[in-house]
UniProtKB/Swiss-Prot annotation:
Protein name: Ribosomal protein S6 kinase delta-1
Disulfide-bonded cysteines: none
Organism placement in taxonomy: Eukaryota, Metazoa, Chordata, Craniata, Vertebrata
Gene that this sequence comes from: Rps6kc1
Localization annotation: Cytoplasm; Membrane; Early endosome
Organism: Mus musculus (Mouse)
Enzyme class label: transferase
Amino acid sequence: MTSPWGHSADLARFYTVTEPQRHPRGYTVYKVTARVVSRRNPEDVQEIIVWRRYSDFKKLHRELWQIHRNAFRHSELFPPFAKGTVFGRFDKTVIEERRQCAEDLLQFSANIPALYNSRQLQDFFKGGVISDGSELIGPAEAYPDSPANAFPECGTEGFSSDSDLLSLTVDADSLAEVDDGMASRQGSPSRTFGLSLSTDSSAVGAVASDSEPSRVEDRESRSLFPSSLKPRLGRRDYLEKAGELIKLALKKEEEDDYEAASDFYRKGVDLLLEGVQGESSPTRREAVKRRTAEYLMRAESICSLRAAPQLHTGPQPPGSLSSRPPWSLRSPAEELKAFRVLGVIDKVLLVMDTRTEQTFILKGLRKSSECSRNRKTIIPRCVPNMVCLHTYIISEESVFLVLQRAEGGKLWSYISKFLNRSSQESLDIKEGRPSMPPRVCLQQPSASPQGGSSFESRGSDTGSMLKALPLKTSLTPSSQDDSNQEDDGQPSSPKWLDSGSSSEDECTAGYLTLCNEYGQEKMDLVSLSEESVMQPEGDKADTQAVSSPASLATGSVSPSTHLRVFSGGEDLEAVSSPPTSESLSRSKNSPMEFFRIDSKDSTSELLGLDFGEKLHSLKPEPLKALFTLEDGDSPSQSLDPGESKRESEAQDSVSRGSDDSVPVISFKEAAAEAISGAEEGRPDLLVNLPGELQPTKEASAMDPKFSQASAGRLDSKLLEAPDVLCLRLSSEQCHGLGPEGPEELSDPTEFCPGGVIPEHDAQADPGVLFEAAVDHRSSPDQFLFSSLRSESDRLGQVEVVVTAQALQESLFHISSPCSGANKEHSAYADTATSEEVLLFTEPTKEEANSLFQRGSEAQERGVGAGEADKEIHQIFEDLDKRLAASSRFFIPEGCIQRWAAEMVVALDALHREGIVCRDLNPNNILLNDGGHIQLTYFSRWSEVEDSCDSDAVARMYCAPEVGAVTEETEACDWWSLGAVLFELLTGKTLVECHPAGINTHTTLNMPGCVSEEARSLIQQLLQFNPMERLGAGVAGVEDIKSHPFFTPVDWAELTR
C-alpha cells in the first residue's frame, strides 16, 4: 500500500475495548484500540488508542445505526447497545456489559465499508495516539494507565522489569512474548494481546483472511488512519528467529539444563547483533540493544552458576545457593537403565546401581498438568539429619529422585513397644526344621561391606541354625498419598492404625495375580482339629513336641537384628516337608503386605491399642483336662473329642477373629510355586527371600525320622496365626508331661553350642532394640540408648501357664520335637528361660513349678471343669495386672531430647532453604545405622504440585492453619514437631487425648511422669495461634534452642 486509498480487501481492521477505569471526574472510561493490518504484508500494522466514555459509545451507536438502516434496510441485524442507568452504573456487571456491547459494535463496523469509512467513526478515533507497526516490537513502554494523563509514545509490553529477567523464577512468557498486534472478538478486557517474537507471518495472514467479509466491495474506501501503511521492505525476520532461540533457552533453563540454555542465549544474541546492523528504525534499534545486553547478562549468570559447585569442594551451609540444583546432580533419563529393582517399599523402589552395586531408594514425582511458574524449584543438598539426594532424573512425565537408604528404618518401628503398641509378628518358617528345642534370641547386626545398604548377615554359627525373618513393626500399616508425602528413605506408611484399607490397591497386577491364586485355596479346618501328636518314628515314648515361647505382646524387631534358633550339640536332619501345593492349600487369604518388603510395617488388630480390652472380652470354653497330667512316662493321654471340637472353636475365635490375623505363606514355598507355574505366565515375586542355612550332612545323621503326615501337620500348624492367648488346645497339650517334669528343669546352657549362655542373652529387654543398631564406640550413642535397659529392668515378669500347648502355640511358633529322653526336661528349661522382647516375659522356674504343681494336685483331687475355669480366670487377671504395669513405662526423656534436637536442626535447615514441610508425621522420621534421626527427603519442584497428607491432617500432626485460608508459614512445622514429641512423651497420639481438637484455650493432658520442661515445650509448640507458637517470633528457631528442655544439648555438635 503506497497510498492511503486502497481496496477493502487489502486491509483488515480489529478493535478491542479493555481496561475500564474511573476517571478523576467520576465517570468510567474505556480504552479503545484499533488496528489495521495489511493482508498483503502482515508486518504492516498501524494502531491507534483512545479513551472513551459510555456516552461516546452511545452516540456512535446511534449514528452508525442510522447509516446501516439507510444502506441496507435491515436494522434488526444491527447489534443492540446497553441501556443507560443512573443507579448501579459503577457495578462490575454493568461496566462489563457496556464494554462488551461497545466492542461488538466496533467489530461489526469492521466488516462493512459504509461504516468503517464513515466520518462518524473517524471522528470517534480523532485525537488518539497512533503507533506505527515498527514500534510494536520496540522498547518496553507501558500504555497510559489513565486517560487523565498525557498520552506518551506508546509501545508494547515486553519484560516487566529487569529483575524479572535476572530472577530464577522468571516467567518464560514475559521474556519471549510481546504484543501480537491482533485482537480477537471474544477477547477478555484484561487480556494482553501481543505478537510473539516467534509468531509466523503466515498465521497473521490466516487470521486476517478469516475476518475478511464474505461480500467483497468493488468500490474504493478510505483508510481509517490519516497516514498510510508504509511497507518496510528492508525488515528481515531476525527478530522472529531470535525469539525462537530465546524461548528454547528459557525452556532448557526451566529443565535445569543450564549448558544448553547458555548456548541458546548466545546464539540468540549473535542473531540480534547481526540483524540490528541494518535496522532503519532508531526505536527498534535501541530496543534490540537493550534486550541483547539482558540476554548476555543472563548467559553469564548461568555460566557462573554452573561453575559454583566446582569452586566449593566442601559442604556448603544451607541457604539459597545450596538450594540451586548443581549440574553434577542432574542425570539424563537414560540413567534409569543402570538401576535394577530389588523390591517395592510402599510407594518407593529399592534399587541397586549395577555399576557400583550400591543400593538406593528411587522415588518418582509425577509432574502436574499445570505447573506453577511462580514456584521456584528448591533441591536441598546440605541439610543435616535428612536423607541425601544422590542424583535426580527428569523425564517427560516424572521427576525421579535417587536417595540414600536409611539403614535404621522408621523411628516408630522401634518405639512402638514403649507407646503401648504391638504389631503383628509373623515369621516365615523354613521347610528344614531342627529336632532340638529351638532357642530364640537377638543377634547384633553385622557390618555391611556395601556403601548405602546393609543386608541381613547370612553367616553360619556352631551347630545348625534356622534363621527367621522378623517382620518389622510400625504404628501404621503400609498403604498411602503424600505424602505428601510419602517417603524417601524407608517404607512410607500412609494409613494409620485404625485404617482398614489394604495395600492391594497399590500393588501391580503381577502381585494381585499371585495373591489371588493363593487366596482361592482354603484351609481345611476339620483336619486341624483332629490332628494327633507329631512324634518321631523311632523312640516315641522318649520324645515330645515343644515350642519356644515368646512374649504374648511383642513389639517390632530391629531391621538390623534377626532371630536365630540355636540347637543342641547333637546332629540334626531336616524334616521332610509336605508338597508345596498341600501346604498352600491349608492357608487362608493372605494380604499383600506379606508379599512386599514393607510388610514389616503391618500391624496386628489383635495386639493393637485395645489389647487389654480384647483380653477381657475373650471368654475361654470350659477345659476340664487343662492341668490333667499323666502319671508315668507314657504320653498317650488325650482329650475327649467333644472337648476337642470346642477347643477348635475357641482357637478359631482368636486366629480368625480379625482380618489382620492371617497365616503367613512361606516365601520359599511361594518361590517354588512361582517356578513351577512359570509356564503359566505367573510373575516373579519382587521380594528378597529371607536367608536359610541348610543343615550339614554330618548334623543330619542322628536326627530322628518323621513321617510325611506328621510333617504336614506341623507345616499346617506353622501356617496358622499364632495363638498368643493359649486358647488353642488339643491332645498334644497333655502329651508326655509327667509330674516330675517341672521339678527337673535343668540349666539352659546345656543346649548352647558353647555350653554357657549369659543371662542377658537369655532374657532380652527393650534396650536391645536400640543397642542392636548403635555403634558402641560412639559415646553419644551410648548416652542415647543406655538408659533404656535400666528402665526396662523395672518391669516384672508375667506368670504364664506353661503347658505344652502354650509352648507349641507361641507367637513365633517355631516347633521341633525333642530327640531323647535325657533332653526332655532340658527343653522345658530352655524354652522357659528364653524370651522375646518387651511387654511380657516368661515364667521363672519357681513359677512354672507352682503352676504345674497346682495342676497335678487338681488332677489327683478330681477337680472338675469349674476349678479349671477358675485357674484360667486367675491367669487372665494376672495378665491384666501385668499389662497395666507395663503400660506405665515410657521412653526416657534423654532419648527424646536427643531426637527432638536433631529434628529441630533438620527443620531449621529446611526453613533456611525455603521449604516448609507442612505435614511432618511419624512416617517422615527415620533412623540411620547409628540410631540418629534422619528425615525423609523434602524438596520443591515447579512442575510438581505440592500436596498434603490428609491422614496427617486428620491425626492432628498438621497445624490447624494447614489447608485453611490462612498463610502456611514455618510455624506449621513447629506444630508438627510438638505433636510428634507429645506422642513420644505420653505414649499416645494427640488425637487420642484430644479428639475434639485443640483451640486457643485447650489445656493439654499429659501424665505426671512428664517433666515440667517437657510440658512447657509441648504447650508452647502446640499453640493454636501460629503467631504465638514457639519458634514463630523474631528470634525464630533460637527460641526453641534456648528452651530449658534443651539445656543439656550441645547445638554446635549437632550442626557439624
